Amino acid sequence: MDAIYENYTVTEDGRALLKKAENDQVETVWDRHKAQQPHCGYCETGLSCRNCIMGPCRVDPFGEGPQQGVCGADADIIVARNLARMIAAGAASHSDHGRDLVEVLLKVAEGRAPGYSIKEPGKLRSVATEYDLAVDGKDDLTLAGELADAMQEDYGTRKSSVTLLARAPEKRRAVWEKAGIIPRGIDRETSEAMHRTHMGVDNDWVSILLHAMRNALSDGWGGSMIATEVSDILFGIPQPNKSTANIGVLQEDKVNIVVHGHNPVVSETVVAACNAPKLLKLAEEKGASGINLVGVCCTGNELMMRHGLPMAGNHLMTELVLVTGAVEM
């Protein structure tokens, strides 16, 4: 096996498939990474800025060239702005994942989401009490609707803090309070991060980074935590499972379907579909012995925890899974 592939992956099957990809002239993530070398030195140090149309600007890290952007931002401000915007993008991604699940929960409550149901009524009631909702005498669907509405309020701008922040240790919350970084609303903090980091707004790098921390907390104790709780309510609480992993989970005699993504809303229905007698019969009619559903990356992990499904690999293995030629979907 070519020595170069040892630098790409520790797995033998991954190395074999990298060689196959090269022979088949299939471009992979490693090829694209190599083509990007050498990376821009200004970008690697965070000293380039494209936040307004007066740029792009860059600051010389050795003090020999420009030390400020056109707007007057120095190295500290540019680095802080760039980091804050990266945090805002990540917080928006995770938190929107949570919003999708809350919207599904609301549709379940309203009877507008066939195929979905409340799998963990106990968890539903437990989380509802954290939102100060009365649970006694209410059926699951009524309570689910109320909880979805309450969670949507956490995305807004009218609250003093996101609800589930109360789970954090009191001493830790006191530190955040003193620093002034208690997140007030999930969308609010992301929007403000984009506002603060624009040209001519916040020109104090300490202030920018403090808000970046607040934005991160709005995700960790807001959007991401909501996503976790609603996933458990709708799809069941994950349990320790025995499973298998790596490319070898693909099966030659079956229809191989790979789920890959960030949100379990679709993947859970794929699990149900792969167990449907009609589709199993169709697979057999086409000459397969059945359907083999495997996971890659985040959604694959969710299915492994809830259903024991095998994992074909992480997100860097996505293209190599396809290089096998054994994947139908």
Question: Could you describe each region identified by the protein language model?
Answer:
Residues 2-329:
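Metallocofactor- and cofactor-centric catalytic cores in central/energy metabolism, strongly enriched
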